[in-house]
Amino acid sequence: IEVETDASEFDAARGAHTGCPGRKSHMGTKADKEKEYTVSELIDMGFKHIQWDGSTPVPIIDCFGRIIAVLAGQPEGSYGSELHEAFCFMQKEASDSGLGKKSKEGPHKCGLFPVLLRGVTMGMGNPHPVSLNPKTMTHLLNRLVGHAAVQRMAKYQNSAFGLWAPRIYEEYRNVHDTMHSKLNLPENFPGTIFAAAAFNLG
C-alpha cells in the first residue's frame, strides 16, 4: 500500500524525537475523544478504507518506496485460537483481581480500562534502566507473561519486527543484550528484544 507522504519529512527522521501529547485545540473536547466513529464517517473525514484479510502481511510504503508501517498479519496454524485464548485468560485474570472501570487502577488515559506495565524503563528522569514496579499486581503480571499464548504473540511480533525493520531491530537487540549483560533486570519474553509490555485489561 503506497501513501502520499515522504518519510524523510517525519520529525523522527531528523534525529532524536520525543512525541508530544498534542495541543488541546487539536485534541478536541472530551466528547470528541470518546466518540465512536462509523466507517462511513471516517471516510467522509478523509480516511481511506483498506480491505485486508487480517492474515496476509502488507507493507505500507511512502512515495519513495520506503516501508513506514506494516500490517504484519499472523502465522498459519492455530494462532487465531491462541489469540482468543490469551484474550479470555486476560479477562479472567483481570476479573479475579478486581480490575475494572471502577478499580483504583482504571480507567487509564488510553481508555476506560486499567493498564498494567511489566519490564524495564528509563523514563521519568531515571539516569539508568530500572524495573517497572507493578506493586500489588506482580503475581498477576507474572502469570500473564508466563502464559503460552501471550508468549506466542510476543515471539511473532518479535519475528515480524526483525523481518520488516532489520536495521532498527538490530539496534534494539544490541541495546537489549548490553543492558541485560550488565544489569539484573526482569525479562518478559526471553528470546525477544522487547524491554517492556503493557497489558490493557478492559
Residue spans for each PLM region:
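Fe(II)/2-oxoglutarate oxygenase catalytic core
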Residues: 1-201
